[in-house]
Design a protein with these regions (language model features):
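Charged DNA-binding/catalytic regions of mobile-element recombinases
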Residues: 1-161
């Protein structure tokens, strides 16, 4: 879950909570975001304290961060997301199979939550729309900045004053 936009960027499902499952979700997030110097916050589950998870984070330039034991408020955004998933998807119907449940969750995340579900903390915009407006304003800001010019002494490019 991207803290800035509330967008689900990496997720995986299975009948267990093995480290491999967590690594699968992490790989999805890395592929989507190509992060550098970001923080991955989680609880202190054994999957997140595993050597394999820590190693993959280091390889990707991600700094692991973990909350204190037994404190749901330490990762309130993730807790809120899962409560919303339960309320809006899982508690509304009985699934005939795990495959049906997986498809419902996939459709909810990729077809509803990320592109359309509005969040008060995002000015009542969806995660996708919030990110779009962020990138648009960055592009506008770049247009307003003066062009980069070579520094006459070092040959390096610096921002013109």
């Amino acid at each position: 879950l991207d803290v800035y936009s509330r967008k689900v960027v990496g997720w995986a499902m299975d009948t267990n909570m093995r480290t491999e499952l967590i690594l699968e979700a992490l790989e999805m997030a890395i592929t989507q975001r190509r992060p550098r110097n970001v923080i991955h916050h989680s609880d202190r589950g054994c999957q997140y304290t595993s050597y394999a998870f820590g190693k993959r984070c280091r390889e990707a330039g991600i700094m692991p961060s973990m909350g204190s034991v037994g404190d749901a408020y330490d990762n309130a955004m993730a807790e809120s997301f899962f409560a919303t998933l339960e309320r809006e998807v899982l508690n509304r119907r009985r699934f005939k199979s795990q495959a049906e449940a997986r498809m419902a969750i996939f459709e909810w995340i990729e077809g509803w939550y990320n592109p359309h579900r509005r969040h008060s903390g995002l000015g009542y915009r969806s995660p996708v729309n919030y990110e779009r407006s962020h990138w648009r304003s960055r592009a506008r800001m770049a247009e307003l900045l003066p062009p980069a010019a070579p520094d006459s002494l070092s040959g390096k490019i610096s921002k013109a004053a």
